[in-house]
A protein has these predicted regions:
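Glycine-rich phosphate-binding loop signature in dinucleotide/nucleotide-binding domains
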Residues: 38-39, 107-115
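Phosphate-handling substructures
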Residues: 18-24, 57-105
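Short, well-ordered beta-to-alpha junction loops that form the rim of enzyme active sites
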Residues: 46-49, 70, 119-124
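Short amphipathic alpha-helical/adjacent loop interface patches that line ligand
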Residues: 29, 33, 100, 104, ...
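Beta-strand elements within well-structured catalytic alpha/beta cores of enzymes
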Residues: 2-7, 114-125
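Acidic, low-complexity terminal tails and accessory targeting/binding regions
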Residues: 1-2, 28, 67, 71-87, ...
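Active-site-proximal alpha-helix that buttresses catalytic centers in soluble enzyme cores
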Residues: 2-67, 89, 137-143
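Short, hydrophobic alpha-helix immediately C-terminal to the catalytic nucleophile
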Residues: 52, 56, 126-131
């Protein structure tokens, strides 16, 4: 099944303006998001602020919206943590792979093969779920992967 993966628009962390947990979009990121379009049956969205705001500021239309931590970013940098999380505990590659397997299991339980699906997520998650078959996505970049 071909699935669309969208990396969030430019965040404050991406622009090197700050190092804070669960950071917001920049003005440029809001502009990038406003250029995004598409029509999807179902959208899976990471619960991180930058992915939610990317979807909020976009012109993407959808039927069902599912928020899940299963497609959030690999916890490495300060921005990859929610406010209540300990940023000294990083996620390993093996832990990310296990989370991807859990996401795929959950994903397949929610969709049917004929549906047009979008996953709004993050650089490392998208790169890993695509098995590194494409370059890591840039901010607000859409990639299509076979799931």
């Amino acid at each position: 099944m071909k699935v669309h993966f969208l990396r969030h628009a430019e965040s404050i962390f991406n622009a090197n303006l700050t190092s804070e947990k669960d950071c917001d979009l920049t003005e440029k990121g809001i502009q990038q998001a406003s250029q995004l379009e598409g029509v999807y049956d179902i959208v899976f969205c990471s619960t991180m602020k930058r992915t939610c705001k990317t979807l909020d500021h976009s012109n993407i239309k959808y039927g069902t919206l599912v928020f899940t931590d299963l497609c959030r970013e690999k916890r490495v940098d300060i921005c990859d943590y929610l406010p209540h999380e300990d940023e000294t505990i990083q996620e390993t590659d093996e832990e990310l792979e296990r989370r991807i397997k859990s996401f795929l299991y959950f994903f397949k339980s929610q969709v049917s093969p004929h549906q047009n699906v979008l996953v709004v997520s993050h650089r490392d998650f998208i790169h890993a779920i695509g098995k590194h078959s494409q370059s890591p996505p840039n901010n607000a970049e859409l990639q299509i992967h076979d799931i």
